[in-house]
């Protein structure tokens, strides 16, 4: 037995004789090595041992070194003696290829089998459930480790590729070279600027006359180089955020920052002392040459806030929406674009602001425009602030006009409308307006105030709603929605041209009750334009009601010269009856179907003033526009009237005019035939002057008669 045990891999085999002693031993027989199990008081056997061996070892350990072969349990001793030698049991079981194959097949279908599945598989393979469980656990660990090693290898390869690409890009940047300019483009630009300045100085020395006229276009071109440098953009963003906070406070705070006017107790005026205490801005530009204008107003408009915000960020859309105020606008530079929308956008813009009267000078300025969204409150903020905190004012403005933090806060409403709070805050150098009434009107802040901006915005939003509507009545002549849109676009171009003819006429502005005649070149000759401004002691609504009555105008021979007319198309532009577009057929009795004269008419009014504009149009061109053709090429010669109230309902304390008054501007154009010279002859000037004076006299007489009756 000993020889056989020694051959068994050189291991010592334990049996009942050499471990527990003989069965016939005396109960008092002591174990020769009583401390044999002492070193295994807390055995840490691996779980790979079979369950039967683990139980036997547990029993041995619980005996605390005493012999279990005492003879008191012969059945137990007999079982132990009959048990095969422990060394013959395989402690590590290697699965067969068939077992592994079947377990791998199940692993592909289900890597996490439940207890029943493992029990069924163990019976099928002749393994214990714990062996099956551990095999699946080890297999999952092995697969996870393989995937981890594979992913690490891929990441290392990708990292090496990125490092190589980065090194190549850096080396390419170091080798960049412009073949066109040879790295001398900035030097060349600096040299050209110096040359331009030198030429300007030469021209100014040769033409020192102070009366030399500089057109607005020239000034705009001179300011094109006033762009924001890269190192100044961070400062601009900080200023934008600060100005947005200032605008928010000016919109929210009432007294003592804003005091109610004593005349109507509704309009408010800015308390300059409180403003200086609350904000540091005026302390940095405290110049006595500048007069400050500040106003605030609220209104609900028929437009959603997103569309309105996008219009503020597009110079063309902005000038089109506010064309009675903004005669021209452009975006000079995009300093910052919003990350995910308009919010955070910062623009450098230029604008020329106007009142539709040649007696009121225009205002031009470069300024920064910033847009910010408060998503929690559903608000958008559009704030303008001057650029001259970074650059000198003389280099950025042409008429010493600065827009202090101004703009609007737009609150979205559930019905798609928007609640707009507008603040207009500017600094203007004193202008010498010849007429005292007009000077008081401008200095009151009403001419360019917040109420005028909101009045124009409300009317333009109603016009846009009419443009998009499909249920507007048009007397049944306009065949389609597209035809109505084309007619409205043609009419809008007519009104804008009329306003530009009044504002952009060169030379000194006319005085009150005088006629100014200018001309402009067109293909084939000159078009004389006569402008007259008259102060009427009547409210602008009275004058507007008279002028929009075409029957009265025909009787007074003001516009139609006594001719009969018929309205063939009518488009309502808003809730007010005075906001409409009409297509009139002139000389109905004498016209045949082959000889039709048409006149396009648009009238618009709000609290800030009224416009009545007319122009004859070619019937063939109108028909093409009705059929969907582009109306932008149809020639127009607009004539009409502009009525501006010089003392609005809120009034101005200390005004020299106590009764309602308004400025009536009459502008007419005549297409001169076969006029090829650059100057108008005296006969043409005399005819135009007589016609416009007669028109003003008839209007004045009609108003006197209406008041007398």
From Swiss-Prot:
The entry's keywords: Coiled coil, DNA-binding, Homeobox, Nucleus, Transcription, Transcription regulation
Locations listed in the record: Nucleus
Coiled coil regions, renumbered to chain: 137-205
Keyword Hydrolase: no
SUPFAM superfamilies assigned to the protein according to its UniProt record, in alphabetical order: Bet v1-like, Homeodomain-like
GO function term, MF aspect, one: DNA-binding transcription factor activity, RNA polymerase II-specific
Pfam families: Homeodomain (PF00046), START (PF01852)
Family note: Belongs to the HD-ZIP homeobox family. Class IV subfamily.
Name of the protein this chain belongs to: Homeobox-leucine zipper protein HDG4
Annotated gene: HDG4
């Amino acid at each position: 037995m000993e020889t056989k045990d020694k051959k068994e891999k050189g291991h010592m085999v334990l049996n009942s004789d050499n471990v527990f002693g003989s069965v016939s031993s005396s109960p008092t027989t002591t174990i020769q090595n009583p401390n044999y199990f002492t070193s295994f008081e807390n055995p840490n056997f691996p779980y790979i041992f079979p369950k039967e061996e683990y139980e036997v070892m547990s029993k041995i350990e619980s005996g605390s070194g005493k012999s279990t072969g005492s003879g008191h349990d012969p059945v137990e001793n007999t079982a132990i003696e009959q048990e095969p030698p422990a060394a013959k049991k395989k402690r590590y079981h290697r699965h067969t290829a068939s077992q592994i194959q079947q377990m791998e097949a199940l692993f592909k279908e289900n890597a996490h089998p439940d207890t029943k599945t493992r029990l069924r598989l163990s019976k099928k393979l002749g393994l214990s459930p714990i062996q099956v469980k551990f095999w699946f656990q080890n297999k999952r660990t092995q697969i996870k480790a393989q995937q981890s090693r594979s992913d690490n290898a891929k990441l290392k390869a990708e990292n090496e590729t990125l490092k190589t690409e980065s090194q190549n890009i850096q080396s390419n940047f170091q080798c960049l070279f412009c073949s066109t300019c040879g790295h001398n483009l900035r030097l060349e630009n600096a040299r050209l600027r110096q040359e331009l300045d030198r030429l300007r100085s030469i021209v100014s020395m040769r033409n020192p006359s102070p009366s030399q006229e500089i057109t607005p276009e020239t000034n705009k071109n001179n300011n094109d180089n006033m762009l924001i440098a890269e190192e100044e953009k961070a400062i601009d963003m900080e200023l934008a955020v600060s100005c947005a906070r200032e605008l928010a406070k000016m919109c929210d705070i009432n007294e003592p920052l804003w005091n109610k006017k004593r005349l109507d107790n509704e309009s408010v005026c800015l308390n300059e002392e409180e403003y200086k205490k609350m904000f540091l801005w005026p302390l940095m530009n405290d110049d006595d040459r500048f007069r400050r204008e500040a106003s605030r107003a609220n209104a609900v408009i028929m437009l959603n806030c997103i569309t309105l915000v996008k219009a503020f960020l597009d110079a063309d859309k902005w000038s089109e929406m506010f064309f009675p105020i903004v005669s021209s606008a452009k975006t000079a530079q995009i300093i910052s674009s919003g990350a995910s929308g308009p919010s955070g956008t910062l623009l450098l813009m230029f604008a020329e602001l106007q009142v539709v009267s040649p007696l009121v000078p225009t205002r031009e300025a470069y300024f920064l425009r910033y847009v910010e969204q408060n998503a929690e409150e559903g608000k958008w903020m559009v704030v303008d602030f001057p650029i001259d905190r970074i650059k000198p004012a003389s280099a950025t403005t042409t008429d010493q006009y600065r827009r202090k933090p101004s703009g609007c806060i737009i609150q979205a409403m559930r019905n798609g409308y928007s609640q707009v709070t507008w603040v207009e805050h500017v600094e203007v150098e004193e202008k010498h307006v010849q007429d005292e009434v007009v000077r008081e009107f401008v200095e009151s802040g009403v001419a360019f105030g917040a109420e005028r901006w909101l009045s124009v915005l409300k009317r333009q939003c109603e016009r846009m709603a009419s443009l998009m509507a499909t249920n507007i009545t048009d007397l049944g002549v306009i065949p389609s929605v597209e035809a109505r849109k084309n007619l409205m676009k043609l009419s809008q171009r007519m009104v804008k041209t009329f306003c530009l003819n009044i504002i952009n006429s060169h030379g000194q502005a006319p005085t009150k009750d005088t006629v100014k005649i200018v001309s402009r070149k067109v293909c084939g000759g000159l078009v004389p334009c006569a402008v007259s401004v008259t102060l009427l002691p009547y409210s602008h609504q009275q004058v507007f009601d008279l002028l929009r009555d075409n029957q009265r105008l025909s009787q007074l021979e003001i516009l139609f010269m006594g001719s009969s007319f018929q309205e063939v198309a009518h488009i309502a532009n808003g809730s007010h009856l005075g906001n409409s577009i009409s297509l009139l057929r002139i000389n109905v009795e004498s016209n045949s179907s082959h000889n039709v004269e048409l006149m396009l008419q648009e009238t618009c009014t709000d609290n800030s003033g009224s416009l009545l504009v007319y122009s004859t149009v070619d019937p063939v061109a109108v028909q093409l526009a009705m059929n969907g053709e582009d109306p932008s090429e149809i020639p127009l010669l607009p004539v009409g009237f502009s009525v501006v109230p010089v003392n609005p309902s809120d009034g101005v304390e200390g005004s020299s005019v106590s009764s309602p008054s308004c400025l009536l501007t009459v502008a007419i154009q005549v297409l001169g035939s076969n006029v090829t010279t650059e100057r108008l002859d005296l006969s043409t000037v005399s005819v135009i002057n007589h016609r416009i004076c007669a028109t003003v006299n008839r209007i004045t007489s009609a108003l006197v008669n209406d008041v007398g009756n």
